[in-house]
């Protein structure tokens, strides 16, 4: 029995060594696949960002290969970026502002879901920290995405809201001591009023309404 136990122990050790060898080989293949994919992903993200008013950006996806094996192989991956000419690439969290992060997340989501069978994309305030021309660029990008996939966007920016094919107004109320969230579709008149409210606040001026109409018409959403 003791001899059998020794034989079994040696057999298990051999199986372990073989499995470890195979795992290391697979991890090495995964490293190569990551490095290849990283180069392609860098180019695609930079192209997306150039369409979002970030045409000077440089992106590097760094694959750091260590010696400790984990469920993800030997690698750790960091996304590094330079948003200004002459500056080295640094980790996203140390470089990008709120508005830049919003656009980077939009670019990432658009690239990573391009080949996937995704029925709907939801963007919750993807426009945080942006305004003006950058907001218009984000609106155009969201509109382009929506031509391929159903897209739901929560926004407080009129430039982006005007790009939507359909508009839903979300409001909160308290009834009988309880909070309720109401969602209601809007016709043209309500769309103009709500976009005007985003432009001017609670007191809607005639100028704000005219501006809202112009935004809708420019986006091709006047009906």
Where are these regions (language model features)?
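Extended, charged alpha-helical coiled-coil/arm scaffolds that mediate oligomerization and mechanical coupling
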Residues: 1-52, 56
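Conserved D-loop-proximal element of ABC-family nucleotide-binding domains
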Residues: 35, 39, 115-116, 128-136
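Long, charged, glycine-rich C-terminal linkers/tails
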Residues: 50-75
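Flexible glycine-/small-residue-rich
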Residues: 61-65, 81-85, 108-110, 172, ...
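C-terminal lobe/lid and adjacent interdomain/linker elements of RecA-like ASCE P-loop ATPase modules
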Residues: 77, 133-223
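GG-anchored amphipathic helix commonly corresponding to the ABC/SMC/Rad50 NBD signature/C-loop
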Residues: 78, 83-86, 101-121
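Walker B catalytic acidic pair
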Residues: 124-125
